Amino acid sequence: KTEIEIINRVVDNINDSIGFSMNIFVKTLYWSKNVMPEAGEYPQSIINKQILDKSDAIIAIFGNRIGSPTQHYESGTIEEIELMIQKGKQVFVYFSDKPVRKSEIDMEAETKIQAFKEKYKDRGIYVVYASDEEFNDYVSMHLTRYLTTELANEVNRVNEHTRFDDSISQRKEVDLIYDYTKFYDIKQVSSYTDSNIMKIR
């Protein structure tokens, strides 16, 4: 999955460069690797509790599918976007405009994607990319700006209440989610019904 590989590569580069100099560490979390199975709850509720609630930001990537519905939203990805917005956390949404095979085109899914874009177009939270290179550039630029802004805000908060000392240089871990709804729907599984989701912590 190229976009996931790109995000991992960008995060590694950030951690090795500005992350190292700024004492910030970005950690990626992926639902299939980082969510522990639980009984008695809906799959999306488990995702939200174990990963979403602990994350500082989310990256959501849409191909030509919007994902599988949850109890409350049209897809798990959309639920996570809405919950993060409600909490005032950072949301990055990317739509792939890369070429796809005709056999992969689903007009019903495409209609849902367009409706989603229309709903969010005035909220300024999504970007359309046409190639892997463009996606790489967007993610790198957006994450870098986000992290430098977060650090500046942290410094300002400290300076408002205490004198500046070595405490501000303690390593800060940033939780960042990304949710990936690619060019297909996965089969329903016991732990989760959406496409691929990765969290960054």
Give the residues covered by each predicted segment.
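Conserved catalytic or regulatory cores that recognize and/or transform ribose-phosphate-containing ligands
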Residues: 1-201
